[in-house]
């Protein structure tokens, strides 16, 4: 599916869920960001993407959770912080890409030009 179609689908989901499309002048703190910033909103979404991709990796490529553990948060953090432990190259690449995006100047606030 083309990127444009995927974006339209996501915009429609938001419109149906919230009753309107994206309003760029909206205060993002109403949706939980600490600052009124669409970049902050994107940063949170990238962090969520890392969590979801690691969760998918664990589900499909590692042993199931020990029943005594209430969730997989600790395992997710272990893999996210040590991507060399991720054996599947597709999962590893996506985590690497997302991590590098989060370290880019747009998300770090570093306004120097390179």
Regions found by a protein language model. Name each.
Residues 1-114:
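Intrinsically disordered, low-complexity regulatory regions
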């Amino acid at each position: 599916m083309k990127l444009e179609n995927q974006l339209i689908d996501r915009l429609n989901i938001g419109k149906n869920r919230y009753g309107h499309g994206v309003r760029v002048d909206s205060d993002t703190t109403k949706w939980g960001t600490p600052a009124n910033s669409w970049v902050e909103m994107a940063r949170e979404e990238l962090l969520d993407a890392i969590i979801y991709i690691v969760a998918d990796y664990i589900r499909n490529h590692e042993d199931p959770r020990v029943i005594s553990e209430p969730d997989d948060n600790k395992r997710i953090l272990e893999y996210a912080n040590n991507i060399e432990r991720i054996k599947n190259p597709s999962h590893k690449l996506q985590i690497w890409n997302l991590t590098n995006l989060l370290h880019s100047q747009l998300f770090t606030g570093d306004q120097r030009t390179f």
